[in-house]
Amino acid sequence: TNGVPGKCTKPGGCSTYCRDTTGTMGLCKNSKCYCNKY
């Protein structure tokens, strides 16, 4: 999966994005947001 840029600039931005869009946990790697199922 491709990381989403711009979601890791704010604390919790990636987590909120992933939860709202896919219902998954968010992980920031290399300044990009990745959504992972748990």
From Swiss-Prot:
Instruction: Tell me the superkingdom of the source.
Output: Eukaryota
Supply the alphabetized keyword list: Disulfide bond, Ion channel impairing toxin, Neurotoxin, Potassium channel impairing toxin, Secreted, Toxin
Q: Which cysteines are joined by disulfide bonds?
A: 8-28, 14-33, 18-35
Main location per the UniProt record: secreted
Gene Ontology CC: one annotated term: extracellular region
Compartments in which it is found:
Secreted
Question: Which InterPro entries does its entry note?
Answer: Scorpion_toxin-like_sf
Task: State whether keyword Secreted applies.
Answer: yes
Q: GO MF terms on file?
A: potassium channel regulator activity; toxin activity
Q: Please describe the organ and tissue distribution of this protein's expression.
A: Expressed by the venom gland.
Q: Which family does it belong to?
A: Belongs to the short scorpion toxin superfamily. Potassium channel inhibitor family.
Other remarks on this protein: Negative results: no activity on the mammalian voltage-gated potassium channels Kv1.1/KCNA1, Kv1.2/KCNA2, Kv1.3/KCNA3, Kv1.4/KCNA4, Kv1.5/KCNA5 and Kv1.6/KCNA6. Is not toxic to mice when intracerebroventricular injected (when tested up to 37 ng/20 g).
Q: What is known of its domains?
A: Has the structural arrangement of an alpha-helix connected to antiparallel beta-sheets by disulfide bonds (CS-alpha/beta).
| Described purpose of this protein according to its UniProt entry | A probable toxin that has no activity on the tested mammalian voltage-gated potassium channels (when tested at 1 uM) and is not toxic to mice. It resembles alpha toxins that block voltage-gated potassium channels.
Q: What is this protein called?
A: Toxin Bot33
The taxonomy runs:
Eukaryota, Metazoa, Ecdysozoa, Arthropoda, Chelicerata
